[in-house]
Design a protein with these regions (language model features):
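Glycine-centered loop/turn motif at secondary-structure junctions
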Residues: 41-42, 78, 104, 165, ...
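Active-site beta->alpha loop and helix N-cap motifs at the rims of alpha/beta catalytic domains
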Residues: 2-150, 288, 312
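A general structural signal for well-ordered alpha-helical segments in protein cores
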Residues: 30, 67, 93, 130, ...
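C-terminal alpha-helical cap/extension of soluble enzyme domains
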Residues: 7, 12-18, 36-43, 51, ...
């Protein structure tokens, strides 16, 4: 890919992976869902097999099929497609990325290996992990700061990784505003060309004001048009408008990412099934899904929010 830097801007949706009642991949629903999402003005691209896409419980062959379907849909719509991998070694990362080179994939987002959370890990190990990958493949890469402190990359290490040729973007989802701010400052001083995509849905609008090029947030599977409008406002420099839209969307986030957060995928799928975009809301174990009572509360709250144009209000917030 020529000059990939600069393309990874805007709203990226880590889509869910639909299953049938029997737990088998539902590729028909996947195509319908991703076709809808990529048709929305302001959506820059799709992200496959991330946490929202239940990547950790998908087999390699299943992931390949998801990458193919979502990638073809994205290409047809003129949008970008990012595949997610979770390698545990450098060799595995290189092998997985090479397997993607002939698929409709524009970049690969890499979950940090478990080793990075094993006690105090030297920054050189984290840097060399990416350096070795970039020497073995030309595939554009997306660095991922997950919301688990023991895995974090410090700002100086991020700047070093950003200097590698094919590291094109960074999903910053630490949910730590101080770390995010310091990282943005150091990247600016380093004149890094790597784009920053905010995964911090608590302060995504503020992320734009601090220099983020876009957002990569699972909650955007619900009320996608409004999240896209927030992104477009920020892209146009209207940060006050973006902040106002985020405030209106707070109730959407609350009905999806309430505790237990691990069931957020199930809640998103319930809404998408209700909207006719996927056939079932089936999730894979060890996720348990939600009770019939919570399902009713969720859809009641969703209906109320939808009637208001997804504006946050005490009268439509889900009962605790």
């Amino acid at each position: 890919m020529t000059n990939p830097q600069g393309r990874f801007r805007g709203l990226f949706i880590p889509h869910v992976t639909p299953f049938g009642d029997d737990g088998v991949l539902d590729l028909e629903s996947l195509e319908r869902l991703t076709t809808h999402q990529t048709s929305i003005h302001g959506v820059a691209g799709l992200v496959s097999c991330a946490r929202i896409g239940e990547g950790p419980v998908l087999g390699l062959e299943e992931k390949q099929r998801v990458y193919e379907v979502a990638g073809k849909v994205a290409r047809k719509a003129g949008k970008l497609h990012i595949a997610t991998i979770a390698p545990q070694s450098t060799d595995e990362a290189i092998r997985l990325i090479r397997d993607l080179e002939n698929l409709p994939v524009d970049a690969v987002m890499i979950f940090p290996p478990l080793l990075l959370a094993w006690g105090k890990v030297e920054s050189e190990l984290k840097f060399r992990f990416f350096e070795d990958i970039t020497r073995a493949t030309s595939m554009p890469l997306v660095l991922f700061q997950i919301p688990v402190k023991s895995y974090w990359y410090d700002p100086a290490t991020i700047c070093r990784i950003a200097g590698l040729n094919n590291v094109v973007a960074f999903k910053e989802a630490s949910f730590d505003i101080d770390l995010f701010t310091e990282t943005m400052k150091q990247l600016e001083r380093a004149k890094a060309s790597m784009e920053v995509l905010s995964g911090n849905d608590r302060f995504v609008a503020e992320s734009y004001r601090l220099g983020a090029a876009g957002a990569l947030i699972g909650v955007a599977n619900v009320a996608t048009e409004k999240w896209a409008a927030m992104d477009l406002a920020a892209q146009q420099g209207d940060f006050d408008r973006a902040a106002a839209l985020q405030k209106e969307l707070e109730a959407v986030k609350e009905i999806v990412f309430r505790e237990p957060i691990v069931e957020a995928v199930a809640r998103i799928k319930i809404v998408l099934q209700h909207e006719g975009l996927i056939k079932t809301a089936t999730v894979r174990r060890p996720q348990l899904g939600v009770s019939a009572e919570e399902r009713k509360l969720l859809l009641d709250s969703y209906h109320a929010l939808k009637k208001t144009g997804f504006r946050s209000s005490d009268s439509v917030a889900m009962a605790s």
